[in-house]
Design a protein with these regions (language model features):
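Membrane-embedded beta-strand positions in outer-membrane beta-barrel channels/transporters
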Residues: 1, 42-44, 90-92, 131-133, ...
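Short loop/turn motifs that connect adjacent beta-strands in outer-membrane beta-barrel proteins
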Residues: 7, 49-61, 98-109, 138-147, ...
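Outer-membrane beta-barrel "beta-signal"
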Residues: 202-214
Length: 214
């Protein structure tokens, strides 16, 4: 990670990437690198708006970057054919638009969004993925650390997958800070076009998350 200024940062990483790790028949301990393994590299530039705790302006963070994976990928419409390498680009951002209290307060309304684009349609199930939403921290009086969340997620399927168009998910959640170290978050999702198929009925998904901070 490099930080040319307090607001601007550059980061990159390189990782060992082995598709064989997904095989359910693999077991035991293995520290070697298989001949089928490749590498995954990712980099991003990030800009923070009003990053200091005492800044009077509303904070925000914006990121742009890309990635490359050197492994072999099968064609979606012909699994017998493969190509080497896959890449994508991403844009992510979050910005507080309303704040309760003075500078440094984390209570208020923050909006966020993201876009991921993997242009090679023949090997990427979801070449397009977009998300947007909002979080309001301290919406309920007396619950300053709770957060009400609404988000939507859109995935556009590859044109090489006939019958699959898009999937849209609407999500509502409420993160309750039970203690300083325990957060409980019930979650409700409504899934439109599950799996990208209009022939499949829309679905309601109910869940919850439990977070413990040590």
């Amino acid at each position: 990670i490099a930080r040319p200024t307090e607001a601007l940062s550059l980061s990159a990483g390189a990782f060992y990437s082995d598709p064989a790790l997904n095989q359910t028949t693999a077991n035991g301990t293995e520290f070697g690198i298989s001949g089928s393994a490749g590498y995954f590299v990712i980099g991003e530039v990030a800009y923070r708006l009003n990053p200091e705790k005492g800044d009077t302006g509303l904070p925000g963070r914006y990121r742009a970057g890309g990635y490359y994976d050197s492994n072999q990928y099968a064609f979606l419409d012909n699994p017998g054919r493969q190509q080497m390498g896959n890449y994508g680009l991403f844009l992510l951002g979050e910005q507080m638009v309303y704040r309760e209290g003075g500078p440094g307060s984390n209570q208020g309304l923050t909006v966020f969004g993201g876009l991921i684009y993997a242009p090679q349609q023949r090997i990427n199930t979801l070449p397009w993925f977009a998300s947007a939403g909002a979080t309001y921290r301290g919406l309920v009086p007396g619950r300053d650390e709770d957060a009400a969340i609404f988000a939507l997620y859109y995935g556009g399927f590859s044109r090489d997958l006939p019958g699959q168009t898009y999937e849209l998910v609407l999500e509502w959640a409420y993160a309750m800070a039970v203690t300083r170290w325990l957060t409980v978050q019930p979650d409700l999702q409504y899934v439109i076009n599950p799996g990208g198929r209009s022939s499949v009925g829309n679905a309601v998904v109910v869940g919850a998350q439990l977070a413990v901070e040590f």
